[in-house]
UniProtKB/Swiss-Prot annotation:
Lineage: Archaea, Thermoproteota, Thermoprotei, Desulfurococcales, Desulfurococcaceae
Protein name: Small ribosomal subunit protein uS5
Classification via Pfam families: Ribosomal_S5 (PF00333), Ribosomal_S5_C (PF03719)
Segments forming a coiled coil: none
Membrane in keyword set: no
Gene: rps5
Cited function: With S4 and S12 plays an important role in translational accuracy.
Tagged with keyword Cell membrane: no
GO cellular component terms, A-Z: cytosolic small ribosomal subunit
GO biological process, one term: translation
InterPro entries: Ribosomal_Su5_D2-typ_SF, Ribosomal_uS5, Ribosomal_uS5_arc, Ribosomal_uS5_C, Ribosomal_uS5_euk/arc, Ribosomal_uS5_N, Ribosomal_uS5_N_CS, Ribsml_uS5_D2-typ_fold_subgr
Keyword annotations: Ribonucleoprotein, Ribosomal protein, RNA-binding, rRNA-binding
Domain S5 DRBM: 55-118
HAMAP family linked: Ribosomal_uS5_A
Amino acid sequence: MPMSAIDKEALETWVPRTRVGKMVVEGKITSLKEIFDRNLPLLEPEIVDYLLPDLKYERLDVGIVQKVTDAGRRSRFRVVVVVGNEDGFVGVGSGKARQYLVALRKALRNAKLNITPVRRGCGSWECRCGEPHSIPFTVQGKSGSVVVVLKPAPKGTGLVAGDTAKAVLRMAGIKDVWTETFGKTKTTLNFAKAVVNALRNTYKFVAPVDWLKA
């Protein structure tokens, strides 16, 4: 079940250290999309908390990794999470630490710093409803050995994808899509990153509907 990803304690004590952070607090930037439109660096997770108060997260994977040192074996938790507002923004991150909560906090921080806008649309030739329930065109993303292809689907199709991809797509606000996957999709982090990279590519092309805006 998705849970709130907002770090209220950190947000309450947040003192911006970057120019973008100061612009957000001063009201000169009022949306996360504005940051991406202006190609500004996103270096503080509190910026995401501030601009997306409805941000949620879902845990994708928890594992224990071991490292052999002179002192013996050291075990640490590795947590993989996806964050999103279910309305056009999504990010994936991982964190390692001896304690689970510390690893979770690191994963959430990384996911927020890796958040990306997602262009939604109705790109299937079988559907012309015009609602942003799918993606506008076919996109591909890669991470490690994993390659993911996302294809627009008509309304009512649902998310035809594996569990990891479904969680990422839901957090992005995508309701209908077909997927093709290649490579070692059992590697949760790479699978999730490949999906996010595919969604990020929805903004690498200017669709006809955006010609007048460009």
